[in-house]
């Protein structure tokens, strides 16, 4: 099982993408997966977002696959091998707020959102953010 969410078609080259029987339901059966497909070649816009429930077989497959995108062993490729071998893999559409902590901006967004959710940090951080945003606007 992999968590997925829809991304813009132009963003598919940044993610592992699920090739699925996409009927719009929250649970979809995978036909395959591809890691960071070249723009315009993705089989869908269902991005794998880094949450997995895996069998030990998938982890064993990591030792049997070739280097993939970026010259690295890709978990996506090991999961795709499961599908190729006839095992069922499902994608579950995530519904909620997600932050891409693989990017600097996403990591900062997650950190700020987390801090603002805490009563012991919210007031001081809110005041600080107001001050620096006001200063930035005034400087423009």
Regions found by a protein language model. Give the residues of each.
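Unchanged
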Residues: 1-114, 119-140
């Amino acid at each position: 099982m992999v968590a997925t969410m829809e991304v813009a078609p132009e963003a598919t080259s940044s993610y592992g993408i699920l090739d699925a029987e996409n009927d719009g339901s929250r649970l979809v059966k995978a036909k395959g997966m591809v890691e960071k497909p070249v723009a315009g070649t993705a089989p869908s816009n269902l991005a794998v977002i880094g949450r997995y429930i895996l069998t030990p077989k998938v982890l064993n497959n990591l030792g049997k696959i070739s280097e993939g995108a970026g010259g690295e062993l890709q978990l996506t490729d090991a999961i795709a091998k499961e599908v190729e071998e006839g095992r069922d893999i499902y994608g579950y559409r995530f519904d909620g707020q997600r932050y891409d902590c693989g990017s600097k901006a996403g990591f900062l967004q997650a950190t700020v959102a987390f801090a603002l959710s805490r009563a012991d940090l919210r007031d001081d951080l809110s005041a600080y953010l107001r001050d620096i945003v006001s200063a930035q606007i005034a400087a423009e």
